[in-house]
């Protein structure tokens, strides 16, 4: 699996922006990706040193479209802690 296939997109929320000062960044990743793959992908894409990776599965919410009930897809969130002094340039200025 390619590194860019594992990391789907960065998560920009109020909570994740607050954690950036601690060197923690949040990403949406593939459901089948493990912590080792996520760490290698972040290091390859952004050229930083990853200290810790925490992952969690997020269940999809129920949604209605008129009388029909559907469900959004489940997804996986990864919170990556970088070595002190490292930062990801994509998130600069947030």
From Swiss-Prot:
GO CC annotation, single: ribosome
GO annotation, biological process: translation
Keyword field contains RNA-binding: yes
Protein family (similarity comment): Belongs to the universal ribosomal protein uL23 family.
NCBIfam families: PRK05738.1-3, PRK05738.2-4, PRK05738.3-2
Stated role: One of the early assembly proteins it binds 23S rRNA. One of the proteins that surrounds the polypeptide exit tunnel on the outside of the ribosome. Forms the main docking site for trigger factor binding to the ribosome.
Record protein name field: Large ribosomal subunit protein uL23
Organism: Symbiobacterium thermophilum (strain DSM 24528 / JCM 14929 / IAM 14863 / T)
Encoding gene, per UniProt annotation: rplW
